[in-house]
UniProtKB/Swiss-Prot annotation:
Superkingdom of origin: Eukaryota
Protein name: Interferon-activable protein 203
Any GO BP: activation of innate immune response
Tissue distribution: Constitutively expressed in the thymus, bone marrow and spleen. Isoform 1 and isoform 3 are present in liver (at protein level).
PANTHER family: INTERFERON ACTIVATED GENE 207-RELATED, INTERFERON-INDUCIBLE PROTEIN AIM2 FAMILY MEMBER
Residue numbers spanned by region Disordered: 84-208
Predominant subcellular localization, coarse grouping: nucleus
Pfam families: HIN (PF02760), PYRIN (PF02758)
Organism, scientific name: Mus musculus (Mouse)
Residue ranges annotated for the HIN-200 domain, each copy included: 190-388
InterPro entries: DAPIN, DEATH-like_dom_sf, HIN-200, HIN200/IF120x, NA-bd_OB-fold
Amino acid sequence: MAEYKNIVLLKGLENMEDYQFRTVKSLLRKELKLTKKMQEDYDRIQLADWMEDKFPKDAGLDKLIKVCEHIKDLKDLAKKLKTEKAKVQEKKKGKCKTAGKKKGQDELSSSESLFINKESYKSVPSSKKKRKQITKTEGGKKKKLTQEQAQLPETSGTNIKKEEDCLQNPHKSPPTPSSSSSNKAPRRGTVPKEPSREEGHHQGPKQVMVLKVTEPFTYDFEETKRMFHATVATETEFFRVKVFDTALMSKFIPGKIIAISHYIGCNGFLEIYRASCVSDVNINPTMIISNTLSESAIATPKISYLLSQAKGTFVNGEFVVFKKSERHECICYGIGDDTGKMAVVVYGRLTNVRCEPGSKLRLVCFELTSTKDVCLLRSVRHSYMQVINEGKPLNPDSVRRNSLEPYF
């Protein structure tokens, strides 16, 4: 089932550290019949695909839970996986009950319909059945219909065609609007302020136009893993994309229309792992993206707007740095605009980026969080940071003040 595979990949394998993932592969090697090369080369998506093939009933979810229960650092993850599995099973039971109830209603409805039709026929006056009908033939002459013909319903060519259409295209009731709007495409005429979200595996293809791309960068120095970020759009919405195959830089050219398939939606991003997931659009490669949509997709949010957003939101934008403070394991920057200011905390590899007050920073995939009642942006594993220009140091008093004392 697709639900089980989503749990295995998105809730399980994607939440493991690299060492933990390698441990799981090792412990499942015999049951999955992994060769040495497969064990070394398979990434999380490939392993999830292989588990689905080997255990089609639950995509190997039970096997993964048992393995996680034997690994000290993954016991909490095993509990979460059990909870997610229970949710799917409960949902499935609910669907079965609903289907059984609907079947009974349909059978009752059919019986009622048959009864009504019979009663309707009985209620037709006998004088009406026996009355001879007069109609015109194609030649204009009048023709009398026999009693038997008069009793039959009209079957003109038009009516026959309508009946055939009804049989071939049964009437469908309009879909009931979903209570959740997270996966809805915006209506034409409305310009979204936030990227659209999709969750789980999507086969596609989805045709999009590339709007903006970062340079490729190394996000894991130990295993030399590289990636780049992109912003793409359809005519009605835009998406943020993580691309984990840097060979695809040749496809992600601003203004180019491409088709993406077999991508994974996760935490507000579309994730692409293989070059085969992206292809050129050769037939009618035209897409009209409005200027307002393009501007909204790449716009920098105001600080006041960020302060109102939920924790866990990922932020892209270009901000002016007015203050810097170096710590033992991180660097804290103060960024601001005419609506307020905020702290940005960077860790690991991004502490090697040289940036001084007065410069403008481009931030991509920074997580909004808070500590000590102060909102801030922090770097995560896939964050990207670039100094756009080095300006003169700013006067901190020229930027509206919020409390940043815990960081400076």
